[in-house]
A protein has these predicted regions:
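Alpha-helical transmembrane segments and immediately membrane-proximal extracytoplasmic
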Residues: 2-588
């Protein structure tokens, strides 16, 4: 019997299998330190010709480094998608065929950050120390420190900048998973690629698109005139809101709970307003709208992602040539997404005809660009007019149902790789856009109260509008990048792996649905939360595969964390305000 040479999907270890068929073992490696599932080993019979030494389309195929994820191989994705499995599966005997351990196996002893990024513990410690040093030293060179003011004011400004950095750090650790979690979970990006990409885009978005005008009373939750003339109390309240929201975000990030940063700030503001301004200091109608988003956001996200994923399975997976169907659907999806986003979020003119023309032009340009890239990378595979019956029989599984919501068996082999390559590329594009937009939007949750507090310290008006300096915008962007680098992998693990198993098609469906819902619901004035919407969208993809494909314990933990976010933020804010007012009474 001739031994077959095979590469393991875990750390590229090689071993021999004395079988008549070639098998590709599946391992669920514990990339994330807080992942509780045991290492799972299964086997899936493959045909030897599928493992060709020369890939036909190296850039878009999921086995390439651009779309390789250490959780699973393409074969395990295929099985997870619902493709027809072999009825007589022969399991590999673990006692006969043991994998030789190498020095790389000592990774389990590394701390969380080192294990997540596959780096040494000394490198992880060096990165953390450098970030901490920069966080402590950079404020000394910022104009917003209050050059020319008294030493006491400079010390308070320094403490305020550190509080803003702490909040931004926790936003990066928790909220950036909204953009990159599904891409990592599906294998479209590795964790290291996702963090590096998000770091550049988050900082760019915060610096280039971050709002330059903010309200002292964030999100219209508090009545502004209640605190007119009470600058010291207002300063303490703003500082306590940053500290309280940051504390709860850090707790949530430690356990991998994706919570809304907006809700954290709202809860902190509500606690401060109730304790020091009374019941009349809170806009209760605005608070009710925020609470209603707990239900509206995940439901809308789940519904849209459910339909998008079913649409993909119905019109791409069931096509005679799924690869060509995916390549044809990609430009359409890009056109719809870019046109809608350009028209709703970035109109260059208030004139409806001009804004619509701009959106259509950008959508067309995006569709043409994506179509050219896909056609160029997939090459002759997509130029073939039709596939032979033998190829179709080998590449796809016949469908027995034709209903839109019916369960459809998907493609296999080369066709599956083409589909995943196309949707993986589209998912990376959508993740990049969401990351850039997130940096420009959510950085205000940290730098809004920060800029208002600095304005009070420097003798500015404590009115309703505060101008945000450019160095404060950059400071908030740096905080987001720092939090993403050190702790971002925790919530990414929850979004990408712990709710339901994701593939490029599922990840794209979830991300496309979440972005669409957030965009249009915001324009319609509906209360919406990007975090809640994305979690709901990931759940919707799981529901599309069956109720058993959603991990209920994870969903239960997430929902509980949502419910307690505002109360916990309020309690912490009251506590911190009391502490800060006592300290300020001695300093000022």
């Amino acid at each position: 019997m001739t031994p077959s040479y095979c590469l393991s999907s875990t750390r590229n270890r090689a071993f021999f299998l004395h079988n008549t068929h070639l098998y590709l073992p599946k391992y669920r490696s514990l990339l994330f330190p807080n992942e509780t599932q045991l290492l799972k080993r299964e086997s899936l019979p493959l045909k030897p010709q599928l493992l060709s030494p020369k890939p036909c389309f190296p850039t878009l195929r999921p086995k390439n480094s651009k779309f390789t994820h250490p959780f699973a191989s393409i074969s395990s994705f295929a099985e997870a998608e619902g493709e027809e499995e072999h009825k007589e599966e022969i399991k590999v005997n673990e006692h006969r065929h043991k994998v030789v351990k190498t020095k790389e196996g000592d990774e389990d002893d590394l701390p969380g950050m080192a294990q997540a990024f596959h780096i040494s513990s000394s490198t992880a410690s060096a990165i953390s120390i450098c970030i901490a040093f920069m966080a402590l030293s950079l404020p000394l060179f910022m104009k917003s420190l209050g050059q020319g003011l008294s030493l006491k004011t400079k010390m308070l400004s320094y403490a305020t900048l550190l509080s803003g950095f702490y909040m931004a750090w926790n936003i990066g650790a928790n909220d950036v998973a909204n953009a990159m979690g599904t891409s990592v979970g599906s294998g479209a990006l590795t964790l290291r690629q996702a963090v590096l990409t998000a770091a550049v885009l988050e900082f760019s978005g915060a610096l280039l698109m971050g709002t330059h005008v903010t309200s002292t009373m964030q999100k219209g939750i508090l009545v502004a005139n209640i605190f007119q003339g009470k600058d010291t109390l207002l300063f303490a309240g703003l500082l306590s809101s940053l500290a309280a929201a940051g504390t709860w975000l850090q707790v949530a990030s430690y356990y991998g709970w994706p919570v809304s940063t907006t809700h954290c700030i709202v809860g902190s503001m509500v606690g401060f307003g109730l304790a020091y301004g009374g019941v009349g200091a809170v806009f209760w109608s605005s608070l009710a709208r925020v609470i209603s988003s707990w239900v509206i956001s995940p439901l809308m996200g789940a519904l849209v992602s459910f339909l998008v994923y079913k649409f993909i399975r119905r019109f791409v997976y069931s096509a005679p040539n799924p690869g060509q169907a995916a390549a044809a659907a990609a430009p359409v999806a890009v056109f719809a997404g870019v046109t809608g986003i350009s028209f709703a979020a970035f109109p260059l003119s208030k004139s409806f005809p001009l804004a619509l023309t701009q959106a259509l032009a950008l959508g067309t340009a995006g569709a043409v660009l994506v179509n050219r890239i896909i056609r160029k990378q997939l090459g002759h595979l997509l130029l073939q007019p039709t596939a032979s019956q033998a190829q179709l029989k080998e590449g796809t599984v016949p469908n027995k149902n034709i209903g839109f919501l019916s369960d459809i068996a998907g493609p296999k082999g080369t066709q599956l790789e083409i589909v995943y390559g196309v949707f993986g590329y589209m998912q990376v594009l959508s993740a990049c856009f969401m990351s850039f937009a997130h940096g420009g939007n959510d950085v205000s949750n940290a730098i809004g109260p920060l800029a208002a507090a600095l304005s009070i310290l420097h003798g500015g008006a404590s009115g309703t509008e505060i101008v945000i300096p450019i160095d404060v915008l950059a400071w908030g962007g740096f905080g987001i990048v720092a939090g993403l680098t050190i702790w971002g992998y925790r919530v990414i693990a929850t979004i990408g792996k712990k709710i339901t198993e994701l593939t490029p098609t599922r990840g794209f469906a979830a991300e496309f649905a979440a972005a669409s819902v957030v965009l249009f619901a915001s324009k319609l004035g509906l209360p919406i939360s990007a975090t809640h919407t994305l979690v709901g969208a990931v759940m919707g993809v799981g529901f599309a595969r069956g109720l058993n494909n959603v991990r209920r314990e994870t969903v239960k933990e997430i929902v509980i964390s949502w419910a307690v976010t505002i109360p916990v933020g309020a309690i912490l804010s009251v506590l911190y305000t009391w502490i800060f007012t006592k300290l300020l009474s001695y300093i000022l």
